[in-house]
């Protein structure tokens, strides 16, 4: 079984280990698409819903077991798809997400759950992205950027980030767009647009 909802819009996901600048580049793309008078819906995961708040709280109050995390992520994503993602795609909007189930594959995969099992569980109900913009930077650069913003969470160690990055690197699909994000913001934005222009030449110019 897989997502069978109506799909007139496009789903673009920004992924990467912490410190890659996902929110910055989602903002650039949103502005570009809105200037073309397209409807854009921007969101993130985990959400601010009931299940997402539990996941966020766990990062502060103490980690849940990986099995508990997986269960909560699936509940949060089901609600997200039903309430926001699917309706937006059905009416023709461009949906831009800061993280999606590839992050779950990477982060919970790094804690011992088979990433392909996670992928299969999600694709039973969640729409496959039209494009994933994987902002890739070396772990050392990510740690430097994270250090500049303050406290780290449980995954923000060299070993943790390296494990997550290796999962992202293992995903091979036509919609997976690797972007070298170890550069200035304007240069990375140009690389993102060029990659997306090849995926959506009728809408996005290089």
Swiss-Prot record:
Protein EC: 2.7.4.9
Task performed by this protein: Phosphorylation of dTMP to form dTDP in both de novo and salvage pathways of dTTP synthesis.
Gene: tmk
Extent of the signal sequence: none
SUPFAM superfamilies in UniProt: P-loop containing nucleoside triphosphate hydrolases
One GO process term, biological-process aspect: dUDP biosynthetic process
One Pfam family per UniProt: Thymidylate_kin
Lineage: Bacteria, Pseudomonadati, Verrucomicrobiota, Verrucomicrobiia, Verrucomicrobiales
GO molecular function: ATP binding; dTMP kinase activity
Residues engaged in binding ATP: 16-23
Annotated GO CC locations: cytosol
Name of the featured protein: Thymidylate kinase
Catalytic activity: dTMP + ATP = dTDP + ADP
Enzyme kind, highest EC tier: transferase
PANTHER family (UniProt xref): THYMIDYLATE KINASE, UMP-CMP KINASE 2, MITOCHONDRIAL
Swiss-Prot/TrEMBL keywords: ATP-binding, Kinase, Nucleotide biosynthesis, Nucleotide-binding, Transferase
Family indicated by similarity: Belongs to the thymidylate kinase family.
Superkingdom of origin: Bacteria
